[in-house]
Amino acid sequence: MNRILFHSLTIPPDQVSTGKLVADIASKFKEKNLNIKILASTPQYRFDSKSFSDNGLKKIGKNKYVSYYKNVEITHLSSSKRSFSRVKRFSQWINYHFKSIIYLTRNRKNFDTIFIFSYPPTMNLIAIFAKKILKKKTIYSIWELYPEIAQKLSELNSNILLNSFKKVDNFCLRTIDEVVVNSNEMKEYLINVRKINEEKITIIYHFANEKESPKSIEITKEIMYAGNLGTPQNVESFLDLFSLSKKQYKLTIYGSGSQYNSIFDRQSENITVNSFISRDELLQETKHIPFALVSLSPKITVEGFPGKTFDYLKMNKILIGYSNPKSSLANFIEKYKLGINISPNEDDLDSKLQILEDKDYIDQVYKNIKEINNKFANVDEVANQYIKLI
């Protein structure tokens, strides 16, 4: 039997949506009697390390823990709490990769196929190691494209580093067996710009393996945002535009990130900012809110697609995109008519919000959300697409 290993940075009980996606896919592999295990870090985003034992993590070595998610065994390599400093965060990645390489080398006879899920972008180093050194079938799932994002957001300004990283990334994508991307736009970019073989690229959308929540009873003038508050999300720019609106909508934010403090300082009668809360708490506190903001820097087009999009849809929220009209996000919202997309620095916000006051339009959007949840947010279908790559 083909022995399969999933390798991710985050995984439950850490409360990060991308980590839960990986775990849910793995659980479906397990249900189909596939030999599947997961290698990830200890919780580092939104989790108290002192309570590891209370949440199912059992220490089995100096820097190693084990837990189970729906009968899938997870090995956790010890990691410190996530830092918002770029230098410290990069150091955390490299430290994690070093521990991963040691683990993979020692356990190389225990798996045949490895699925590697990026973030962080330096996961490409592990993909190269798994294919070239360990000679394993390697499938790399890319959810964000680097160094393009770092370059566009001016997070990395050294041409030497940018070119070096791109060469390493291209070497990775040309060397491994299969590449998974989350949008057609990213696939086309890899083919036309990065010159990656089309035959090895598969499109698999993000999804949210959660029960669909009831829609809001009333269509009120309330918007929610839940997630990361960093540079790529561009939430501060949306607040600039939102503050000029005469529509008197209210925006409630839940999250954490490098821009949290500056966003928190912008609270007003119409803007409320809260720190991160669990998904169950979020559902309860936002069940009356009909709209959800998905914000993305206008510099990002094909390089990233916010995973929270599908989580919002499972929460039955009508999407308000704030992104480049040429972005994968904007194309997705408009193609499937799931709400509106606002072009940063160009569109008049109030004219777009006016669209959301049309009852017939809202009724149709809810029907479209239902269809998308059945089509793309089905974990069985997503898992089957991954299984076909083995």
Could you say what each language-model-derived stretch is?
Residues K166, N170-K200, A330, Y386:
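A short, active-site helix/loop in glycosyltransferases that binds the activated sugar's phosphate group
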Residues P344-S351, E357-I390:
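A charged, aromatic-enriched C-terminal amphipathic alpha-helix characteristic of glycosyltransferases
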